[in-house]
Every structure is written in structure tokens, then in C-alpha cells.
């Protein structure tokens, strides 16, 4: 390239950069994309309420199957989100029967949920979803909001706006509107207002008491429940063992599974300036999430992430000085691959990676069920290994893992992502998991059985809600609050049934 042309290209690039920056700043000042989305959703809920007297949409009649739409975070290969919904669907099918249900579920990418959610129609969710939800809910008899982080600004306001939108639209058309097993936490003021206004007529069975209190403070009635992943049945152990052996495991050495994340790049927020700069100049690729949404980024985020991964690597190295273990790195969501690769490098490389972009939820959970110990920053990696009594600890960014360890009476097994002594504490924690697996597993078993009972009670509450709204709906005798919570669970995998019937069980 000739020097004059090089000069022209440099000037053109600078000009484009200035144009992109100015355009982005003007767009950002003109509108907050999160608030715009919330206002759009609110307007359509109000429109649905006005439309209802003239056009109520689908309304259940005796003899028809009950049409329910599950609204969540499926289609991103987030293993936890998919597992909890898989079990939710199994519970609904158990309670109401396939002959009486017509189920649909939202998915961000149908290719990533292919083979999941048997008997359920998958509906692709567009990036700009308010009008889609307005039309889709109109054709249903009810909405089941099923995202775990149901009412939170911690990860993305857009996701909670989707949850509120589904519930609000269903309530506006006098349909079933249920939030099932989700959490409420700290919310931006605009999202809090949306929840307060449009979830007041929904029925929320939250994941814990803290969420109930949070919702009650907003004037939203809620019952306490639990997560719904406890009954999940992964692929057979032989699948997990085969995958591990293909990765170099000898079949005998203890397996240590580490599940890192990037806890510092949340929340995902819209940034129109960055969106313009990415489109025009290809900038911000590492921070880009989707559309005009970007992860929190910058030198401070990178430094905190590096410190977190370095501490995990150092604590693991110290532990392995006198121990032998086959270390594997597990990404429970596709987004975790970068963290797994970075941790692998800090451990010297050569550690096998098992990430959800390559392994479905059945295979991935089968892999981690083979571990002798698990340390995870992913809540559902811990939950899905607990029925297998895998000794586990967490390195947590929020209250979910803290609450889980407290429920096990093992709060000391919840480490913190920003602990300046994380390496030291991790070394000691790994020693405990390997030296006292029976003691750790005893707390795990009691917690699993307790949470299964709570999940059964959630089924009882759900039955009573449907019965009150649709007295003519054919519900089996013995179901509801007059029955046993254990009859309201889907079929338990054999090893889980043994936990329930064993010395620590309830039956």
C-alpha cells in the first residue's frame, strides 16, 4: 500500500471513530435501552388489559388440554437453567398428565436445546421480544416464569423484564400466571417498579425465604419453595466415565472438578455507544454479549478476574503438592469457556475441559457426578452433584451458594470470589473435601432430602392454584395440600430414591 493511501486510511479510520463515538453518545443520551424495553413491555401489558374484554384470547375450557408457556433462559447452553426447567416440566407432566397438557417453551437458540424438554414445543425468542410475547401469551392458557434469577438486576434487566412481561400479560388476560422456583434480589428502580405493578396478580413460589421477603416488600404475594433441579437424571455413569477416560483419566485416580466463571463482568447492560463502535470499527469484541448488550469490562474487571483465577490455580497447586488428582475444568455455560481456558493456562496447561458448548446437560452432569470432589462458582454444578453425594464447595459471587451451604449446615464451604486469602482457604477446603468426604456427604444427603420435600410441597401449592382457577380441570385424587408432598414429585432416579428411603430419608 502506497504511503498516500496509508495516510488516507488512517485519517478515514480516525474519522469513523469520531463519528461512531459522537453517534453512540447521542444515542445513549437519547434513551436507556433497558428502560425502553421495560416501557415497551409495560405498554403492551396495558394494551392486553384493554383488549381483554373484547378479545380475551385463549381461555381454558373443560375437555381441552391446558396450554402453558414456560418462559426462561433456555437456548444459551446454561446447564443450570436447562436442568431446572427440564425437571419443572417433568413435575408438571407428572401432576397434570400429558393428555391434559399442551406445553411450549421459549428458547433463544433452538439448535442449542434440540433434544431437550420432551413433549414440549420450542418457540424461538427474538432479541426484541415484547410484541412477540404479546402475541404468544394471547394464545396460551397460562405462563410459567422459570428463570432462576427471576427478579434481579445482577445479571441482566432484560431477562427479568421478560419474566415480568410474561407474568403481566398472563395476569392481564386472567390466565394462569406462575413464577416457579425463582429468586428476587437487588433490582434497579425501574425494574422494581415493573415488578411491583405487573406481578401483583401473579402467583410466585420463590426459591427461598429471602426472595419471599423481597417480593412481599413490593406488595407481591409469594410462597417459599426451592430450586427444581434436585430430581434431574443425567446420562448413566458409564457416559461420564467414558468421557473422562477419553480425556486421559485412568479410571482410578480421584477426579477433582473445578468450575470457574467470570464473576466480575456482570451485569450485562445495553450500551448504544459501544454498539455503534462495535458495528463500525469492530471494537469491544471481548465484552460483547448480544445485540447492544455488553458485559462489564475494563482494566479493573480484568485485574479482579485474574486475581480470582490465580488464587484458584495457586490453591489447587498447593493441594496437589502432596496429593494425586485428575483435575478437570468444567464450563456449565458456554460463556465459561474463556474462564476455563484461562485457568487451564495458570495451572500449566494440559487439563481436560468439559464445556456446555460441546456437551449437553445429560453428559455434562454425568461427568461431574464422577468427581471425588467439586469446587464451583456455578450454583447448579453443586446442586446437580449433590444427589450423587459428591463432596463439594463453592467460590461464590452472590447469595445463592452461601444459602445452599447454609442449608447443608456447612457455611464454611462457601468461599468468596474476592477473598484476598482465597488460595489459602481453597487449599484447606480441598483437604477437607478429600479427607472427610463422608462428613461432607452426610450434610449433602440431608439437604437433598429436605429440598425434595420442599419441591414436593411446591407441587401441592401448584395443584391448589390450578384447582382454584379451573375447578373443572381433571386433577387426580390425592393431589394437593391434603396429600403427601412426596406424591407431587416426578419419578425419582433410583439413586435419589435410595437417598429418600435411606436412614436419613423421610419415607
Located regions from the model:
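Active-site anion-handling motifs in enzyme catalytic cores
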Residues: 2-507
